[in-house]
Curated annotation (Swiss-Prot):
A cytochrome P450 monooxygenase involved in the metabolism of various endogenous substrates, including fatty acids, steroid hormones and vitamins. Mechanistically, uses molecular oxygen inserting one oxygen atom into a substrate, and reducing the second into a water molecule, with two electrons provided by NADPH via cytochrome P450 reductase (CPR; NADPH-ferrihemoprotein reductase). Catalyzes the hydroxylation of carbon-hydrogen bonds. One of its GO terms (biological process) is estrogen metabolic process. This is Cytochrome P450 1A1. The keyword Transit peptide does not apply. Heme binds at residue 462. Gene3D superfamilies: Cytochrome P450. It comes from Felis catus. InterPro entries: Cyt_P450, Cyt_P450_CS, Cyt_P450_E_grp-I, Cyt_P450_E_grp-I_CYP1, Cyt_P450_sf. It catalyses: an organic molecule + reduced [NADPH--hemoprotein reductase] + O2 = an alcohol + oxidized [NADPH--hemoprotein reductase] + H2O + H(+); estrone + reduced [NADPH--hemoprotein reductase] + O2 = 2-hydroxyestrone + oxidized [NADPH--hemoprotein reductase] + H2O + H(+); estrone + reduced [NADPH--hemoprotein reductase] + O2 = 4-hydroxyestrone + oxidized [NADPH--hemoprotein reductase] + H2O + H(+); estrone + reduced [NADPH--hemoprotein reductase] + O2 = 6alpha-hydroxyestrone + oxidized [NADPH--hemoprotein reductase] + H2O + H(+). Interacts with cytosolic chaperones HSP70 and HSP90; this interaction is required for initial targeting to mitochondria. Interacts (via mitochondrial targeting signal) with TOMM40 (via N-terminus); this interaction is required for translocation across the mitochondrial outer membrane. Pathway: Steroid hormone biosynthesis; Lipid metabolism; fatty acid metabolism; Cofactor metabolism; retinol metabolism. It comes from the Eukaryota.
Length: 517
């Protein structure tokens, strides 16, 4: 038998033809078997063809948020890719994401059972573990209440309005003194290395009731690992989708395991010390508050759900992480924009002088009277979108979205970067323009500000969002009231985001400050 292929005659036996037909049918049957049966009236999400075995991992490259944003322009706000053999639903568009995470929040509140997540808090992280049931919900409420009690609740021992204001004020004043000292010694500095410790000190004060020296090696060893943690938990980590990578030599994975082990040892140590000194009726911080709940043996008023000693460590670990990395990254990006847009810095300082003056320190209660500063922070959140994806979600049951069928336990990527750079929403998304958030009368455009998505939405929304926004505001207000940031003329400042769970910028060692007169 002769088979014609591209105009060429190729000899082939009947047996070979039969075998080829059998293999083709087998592959077709396996592919069909893997695909979920779509209920009548619904469709499967569209998406590009991927490579066998690899899926779209090569397509995603080093900046998956950008690639997936471009794909959404072609395939729509609900599309599907494969990483390895794992199907992944990708959501874009503000309305679509609100529909999924808010209006259908119960359907999309799960977490995928990814390998990298099992390495965080011994697989029991409130933020990363697949659990989304009653115990998880009760732990989340407890964590929120504890965080609120030792952040925005009033501090009877201080003249500040709340614990957070007291802690941030002290750390901001320390930074101003440190920056002056560095200017006198060497004439320039990298602010990130000092901001990161000050922010860590704020969450340490709330969680553990203590402040560290900026050269304390124990704390430095923890805070300097934040970049590596973000690399390991970023959406699309190959080790989560190609199991063989867990067994091959993998320095990045080994390092990620080491990061989590060191962090776990640190948190265990702090919680153990609190148990030794705990006094009922004398609650000093978040950890004490959780211990008290543990000893009361009830986590929820309406359910017999208990908080074990081990879970305290996991909750504290989540709160420390939520209150640390995001705030550090936000303040660091703010400083970068201030030195690259000196006119913006000048406007913020003029507003501070008009509203507060120099006779007293800024307070959290001043926030509503400083709309330009608030607009600057909102525009930094939007323009950087430094949390490009939420932590991956997972569907808790078979569901549908925008006419597409989504089966249970489908991994879901939520592209926050795409929302914040959607031309239909922003017109000129590439431009850094804080004024876009101001109304003609100079107040914040609330409707537009709510379209900036950085902390997630719905039932998995970041529990530290309110605290983070307040902390970033107060750090900046105190710093900018007293000092002016700059870099030497002609210095190139690299503003290129580096992909990760939170996207950082290249470190800049050329910062300078001068005291405002």
């Amino acid at each position: 038998m002769m088979l014609s292929v591209f105009g060429l005659s190729v000899p082939i036996s009947a047996t070979e033809l039969l075998l080829a037909s059998f293999v083709f049918c087998l592959v077709f049957w396996v592919v069909r078997a893997w695909q979920p049966r779509v209920p009548k009236g619904l469709k499967s999400p569209p998406g590009p063809w991927g490579w066998p075995l690899l899926g779209h991992v090569l397509t995603l490259g080093k900046n998956p948020h950008l690639v997936l944003a471009r794909l959404s322009q072609h395939y729509g706000d609900v599309l599907q890719i494969r990483i390895g053999s794992t199907p992944v639903l990708v959501l874009s568009g503000l309305d679509t994401i609100r529909q999924a995470l808010v209006r259908q929040g119960d359907d999309f509140k799960g977490r995928p059972n990814l390998y990298s997540f099992t390495l965080i808090s011994e697989g029991q992280s409130m933020s990363f573990s697949p659990d989304s049931g009653p115990v998880w919900a009760a732990r989340r409420r407890l964590a929120q209440n504890a965080l609120k009690s030792f952040s925005i609740a009033s501090d009877p021992a201080s003249s500040s309005s709340c614990y957070l204001e007291d802690h941030v004020s002290k750390e901001a004043e320390y930074l101003i003194g440190k920056f002056q000292e560095l200017m006198a010694k060497v004439g320039h500095f990298d602010p990130y290395r000092y901001v990161v410790v000050s922010v860590a000190n704020v969450i340490c004060a709330m969680c553990f009731g203590r402040r560290y020296d900026h050269d304390d090696q124990e704390l430095l060893s923890i805070v300097n690992l934040s970049n590596e943690f973000g690399d390991g938990t970023a959406s699309g980590n190959p080790v989560d989708f190609f199991p063989i990578l867990r067994y091959l030599p993998n320095p990045a994975l080994d390092f990620f395991k080491d990061v989590n082990e060191k962090f776990s040892i640190f948190i265990h140590k702090m919680v153990k010390e609190h148990y030794k000194t705990f006094e009922k009726g004398h609650i000093r911080d978040i950890t004490d508050s959780l211990i008290e709940h543990c000893q009361d043996k009830r986590l929820d008023e309406n359910a017999n759900i208990q908080l074990s000693d081990e879970k305290i460590v996991n909750v504290v670990s989540d709160l420390f992480g939520a209150g640390f990395d995001t705030v550090t990254t936000a303040i660091s990006w703010c400083l970068m924009y201030l030195v690259t847009s000196p006119n913006v810095q000048e406007k913020i300082q003029k507003e501070l002088d008009t509203v507060i003056g120099r006779e007293r320190q800024p307070r959290l209660s001043d926030r509503l009277q400083l709309p330009y500063m608030e607009a600057f922070i909102l525009e930094m959140f939007r323009h950087t979108s430094f949390v490009p994806f939420t932590i991956p979600h997972s569907t808790t049951k078979d569901t549908s979205l925008s006419g597409f069928y989504i089966p249970k336990e489908r991994c879901v990527f939520v592209n926050q970067w795409q929302i914040n750079h959607d031309q239909k929403l922003w017109g000129d998304p590439s431009e850094f323009r804080p004024e876009r958030f101001l109304t003609p009368d100079g107040t914040i455009n609330k409707a537009l500000s709510e379209k900036v998505i950085l902390f997630g939405l719905g039932k998995r929304k970041c529990i530290g969002e309110t605290i983070a926004r307040l902390e970033v505001f107060l750090f900046l207000a105190i710093l900018l009231q007293q000092v002016e940031f700059s870099v030497p003329q002609g210095t190139k400042v690299d503003m290129t985001p580096i992909y990760g769970l939170t996207m950082k910028h290249a470190r800049c060692e050329h910062f300078q400050v001068r005291m405002r007169t």
